[in-house]
Swiss-Prot record:
Coiled coil: none annotated. GO terms for cellular component: cytosolic large ribosomal subunit. Keywords: Ribonucleoprotein, Ribosomal protein. The lineage of its organism: Archaea, Methanobacteriati, Methanobacteriota, Stenosarchaea group, Halobacteria. GO terms for biological process: cytoplasmic translation. It comes from Halobacterium salinarum (strain ATCC 700922 / JCM 11081 / NRC-1). This is Large ribosomal subunit protein eL31.
Amino acid sequence: MSASEFDDRFVTVPLRDVTKVPSHERAGEAMNIIRQHLAKQFAVDEDAVRLDPSINDAVWSEGNNNPPRKLRVHAGSFAEDGETVVEADYEG
């Protein structure tokens, strides 16, 4: 794989919209917002975004009702089987 096929960046994902859903659904909605934000930043489908379990741990660290207001992730996109895939890790 050449360097031009790999796109690596740090992305800060704002999670302020998570307050628009009921408190008992906030951590799950935060995970959806992270996936949507990364898909938009890298211009791929949401199905092509792979989130590391460390992101899940960071979102759920304060429980379901109180996810963080923003999250910094390290994301990289690369070609796999002819499709672009994005993998993201928590940058804490």
